[in-house]
Design a protein with these regions (language model features):
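Symmetry-related core transmembrane helices of the 12-TM Major Facilitator Superfamily/SLC fold
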Residues: 156-175
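C-terminal ends and interior cores of transmembrane alpha-helices
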Residues: 75-91
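A late C-terminal transmembrane helix in Major Facilitator Superfamily
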Residues: 122-152
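Cytoplasmic membrane-interface "Motif A"-like loop-to-helix N-cap segments
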Residues: 59-77
Length: 214
């Protein structure tokens, strides 16, 4: 399921980087410099939005449990799909750029939220799981490219991709964890908190001992 969700976020990102500049030139009459700046803003979102997706997933998991990670991913991908539909129907440059930045924010956060789930799928095969999910991004980009060739219109391709992403967001809800898995992860989390508390206590006691000796 995470293979599909990553195809719907990172795969779309790769596709957008490949066609968005020419889309702005052909549809809105922008020059290459303006189109490049618009697409560059989309790419710059990755500098912080991915981390935001991962951190939001961590915070929700601390408050509402492991299943909330999957629900967050579903919500981000759903908003991404809505943003793609908005982008494809935009009639002006300003509206198109706004829509692209909006769905781009959700897209990059979805990438981070996807990989926030990776360690909890199978700890014994963490590298394999990460590799398979990562491959989903490349498959998604290739599939989007073939879809664009089949449809012929980039604008209509974005519309169809928006629908696919909305449908793909349901795959995030299909990510389930057994009760034993949730209990095990909760125990690991509590043990990590306890170890962190003990480490901080030792550091404080060491500092106080050093100050008293001086």
């Amino acid at each position: 399921m995470l293979f599909v969700t990553y195809a719907g976020c990172f795969g779309i990102e790769l596709f957008v980087h490949g066609v968005a500049a020419s889309y702005y030139v052909d549809r809105f009459g922008l020059d290459l410099r303006g189109a490049g700046l618009a697409v560059g803003g989309f790419g710059l979102l990755a500098l912080f939005a991915r981390a935001m997706g991962g951190m939001a997933s961590d915070r929700l998991a601390r408050r509402h449990g492991l299943a909330s990670r999957a629900r967050l991913l579903c919500a981000l991908m759903f908003c991404e799909g809505i943003g793609l539909l908005w982008f494809s129907s935009a009639q002006g440059v300003a509206m198109a750029v706004t829509a692209m930045l909006a769905f781009g924010m959700c897209l990059h956060m979805a990438c981070g939220a996807t990989y926030a789930l990776v360690p909890f799928v199978d700890r014994k095969a963490l590298g394999g799981v990460a590799g398979i999910i990562g491959a989903g991004g490349n498959v998604g980009a290739v599939a989007a490219g073939f879809l664009q060739k089949y449809i012929g219109s980039v604008q209509h391709t974005f519309t169809v991709l928006g629908g696919f992403v909305i449908a793909g967001s349901l795959c995030a809800l299909a990510v389930r964890f057994s009760r034993e898995h949730v209990t095990s992860e909760e125990r690991r989390y509590q043990e990590a908190l306890q170890q962190n508390w003990l480490l901080q206590s030792r550091e404080l006691s060491t500092d106080s001992t050093g100050r008293s000796s001086t």
